[in-house]
UniProtKB/Swiss-Prot annotation:
Keywords: Electron transport, Heme, Iron, Membrane, Metal-binding, Mitochondrion, Mitochondrion inner membrane, Respiratory chain, Transmembrane, Transmembrane helix, Transport, Ubiquinone. Heme b b566 binds at H65, H164. Heme 1 (or BL or b562) is low-potential and absorbs at about 562 nm, and heme 2 (or BH or b566) is high-potential and absorbs at about 566 nm. The keyword Endoplasmic reticulum does not apply. The chain crosses the membrane at residues 1-21, 45-66, 81-101, 146-166, 194-214, 256-276, 288-308. It comes from Colaptes rupicola. The gene is MT-CYB. A ubiquinone binds at H169. One of its GO terms (biological process) is mitochondrial electron transport, ubiquinol to cytochrome c. It holds the Pfam family Cytochrome_B. It is a multi-pass membrane protein. This is Cytochrome b. Its main location: mitochondrion. PANTHER family: CYTOCHROME B (PTHR19271:SF16).
Amino acid sequence: FGSLLGICLLTQIITGLLLATHYTADTTLAFSSVAHTCRNVQYGWLIRNLQANGASFFFICIYLHIGRGFYYGSYLFKETWNTGVILLLTLMATAFVGYVLPWRQMSFWGATVITNLFSALPYIGQTIVEWAWGGFSVDNPTLTRFFALHFLLPFLIAGLTLIHFTFLHESGSNNPLGIMSDCDKIPFHPYFSVKDILGFMFMLLPLTTLALFSPNLLGDPENFTPANPLVTPPHIKPEWYFLFAYAILRSIPNKLGGVLALAASVLVLFLAPFLHTSKQRTMAFRPLSQFLFWMLVANLLILTWVGS
């Protein structure tokens, strides 16, 4: 899945650059500039659909990548694992600020709700929120800085990916049996390159199918309406890939408690290397651990469903 994530990142950066050339980071023009891109720019609709649905595939791949690492004990490469978790956090931040850019109903209210969570921090919370907003509400300054961040962060992700690679090459990669990988040290081309191309085909086929046939399947219908600060949508919710965390946030009646639980739901990944007690590295021969792992997967799926 690592190679697929690389392709995702490349696709997102290319489509994103093309979209940025037609985008206007201004509250009065953002929505219509996106509509203009879809209607009047050659293949603008395709570029936008690939960008929007590419994000979904990026998260599908990263969740599978993390799950696979969890199952096969890859977290014992501590540096590789920790840089990976930092990559996940950066990706989540990038997706969040990018979601706000078209300045639609759910974008606007999602940004308002999520940035407002920082106000739960004691003493400094309110100041941080107003500083992030650039005022007393989500408005033009917020949109401008979110665009700047959304442009910058993917390149930070690319840089972190190289660090991730460097640490991985220190140790060599893991395998399903959790034993030495020396026998896998074969020429990259044609062996691994052909294996990767198969993966690319398996990912790019559903991505193009989704982008061409039902590009709005995973989106929110509220997003066809331009942002209106005076009308709150009946239920505010993020994109599907954040629903598990959002469900955890919403299930706790206390604001600070919810924020801490939301943060913990992702940051708990940092603890994985310290919680490994087994003599065996992978779960391949540990039925009880396998059971707990699949319980975790089921739990996340149920949270995603409940969150919507």
